[in-house]
């Protein structure tokens, strides 16, 4: 198994300027790329004989609209993929920043990694990130009539509608949420108050 530094150098050399940034931090390698290079970066990571990242272990969306309790200045959405090379016993992360915050779209990697199918559907369902050329991009965790994307940071915690069984209609119905929205402020305990002093 090669070291993290060796992997960093190999990835930087193989991807060249297709990788916007190659970051080595906390014992991990992260490749950040632009949407127009996403497919070529993922293909190179899978097919290059020195890398051979043949497994997509995970793919998820991320909403950076507020990050570290402050307003985020960059792009709002990213798609993050975790790749594994069984042959080399190495892992790598690929982050692609989605260009449009209002209508986030990125290319699908289903043709490169079959396992991306349901992961991309989940990112679409939860974050509203569209994946071009996905064979079956539809909701996977929420109802077909669900409004909004619940993992977006601007989605209300209680949601917009609730469902319940209506005895008169003998079916499940949707109705506006009856929970009063409120701000929850945590109680702060200072050290000087420890121990009942």
Curated annotation (Swiss-Prot):
Q: Which GO terms describe its cellular component?
A: plasma membrane
Annotated GO molecular function terms are: NADH dehydrogenase (ubiquinone) activity; NADH:ubiquinone reductase (non-electrogenic) activity; quinone binding
Reading the lineage from the top rank, the first entry is Bacteria
- UniProt xrefs under SUPFAM superfamilies: Nqo5-like (SSF143243)
> What membrane topology does the UniProt entry give?
Peripheral membrane protein
EC assignment: the record states: 7.1.1.-
Per UniProt, the enzyme's principal EC class comes to translocase
Q: Which UniProt keywords apply?
A: Cell inner membrane, Cell membrane, Membrane, NAD, Quinone, Translocase, Transport, Ubiquinone
The record's annotation in InterPro entries points to: NADH_DH_suC (IPR010218), NADH_quin_OxRdtase_su_C/D-like (IPR037232), NADH_UbQ_OxRdtase_30kDa_su (IPR001268), NADH_UbQ_OxRdtase_CS (IPR020396)
Compartments it resides in:
Cell inner membrane
Query: What reaction(s) does this enzyme catalyze?
Result: a quinone + NADH + 5 H(+)(in) = a quinol + NAD(+) + 4 H(+)(out)
The entry describes its oligomerization and partners as: NDH-1 is composed of 14 different subunits. Subunits NuoB, C, D, E, F, and G constitute the peripheral sector of the complex.
Concerning its family, UniProt says: Belongs to the complex I 30 kDa subunit family.
This chain's function reads: NDH-1 shuttles electrons from NADH, via FMN and iron-sulfur (Fe-S) centers, to quinones in the respiratory chain. The immediate electron acceptor for the enzyme in this species is believed to be ubiquinone. Couples the redox reaction to proton translocation (for every two electrons transferred, four hydrogen ions are translocated across the cytoplasmic membrane), and thus conserves the redox energy in a proton gradient.
Entry protein name: NADH-quinone oxidoreductase subunit C
What's the source species for this entry?
Neisseria meningitidis serogroup B (strain ATCC BAA-335 / MC58)
Q: According to the entry, what is the taxonomic lineage of the organism?
A: Bacteria, Pseudomonadati, Pseudomonadota, Betaproteobacteria, Neisseriales
Q: Which gene encodes it?
A: nuoC
């Amino acid at each position: 198994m090669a070291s993290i530094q060796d992997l960093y150098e190999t990835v930087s050399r193989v991807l060249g300027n297709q990788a916007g940034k190659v970051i080595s931090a906390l014992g991990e390698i992260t490749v950040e790329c632009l949407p127009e290079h996403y497919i070529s970066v993922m293909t190179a990571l899978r097919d290059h004989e020195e890398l051979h990242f043949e497994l997509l272990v995970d793919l998820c969306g991320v909403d950076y609209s507020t990050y570290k309790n402050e307003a985020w200045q960059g792009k709002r959405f990213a798609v993050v993929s975790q790749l594994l090379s069984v042959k080399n016993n190495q892992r790598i992360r690929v982050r692609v920043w989605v260009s449009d915050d209002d209508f986030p779209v990125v290319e699908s990697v289903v043709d490169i990694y079959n396992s991306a199918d349901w992961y991309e559907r989940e990112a679409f369902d939860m974050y509203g990130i569209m994946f071009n050329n996905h064979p079956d991009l539809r909701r996977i965790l929420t109802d077909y009539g669900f409004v909004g994307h619940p993992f977006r940071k601007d989605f209300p915690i209680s949601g917009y509608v609730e469902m319940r069984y209506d005895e008169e209609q003998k079916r499940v119905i949707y109705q506006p949420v009856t929970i009063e929205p409120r701000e929850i402020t945590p109680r702060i305990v200072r050290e000087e108050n420890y121990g009942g002093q």
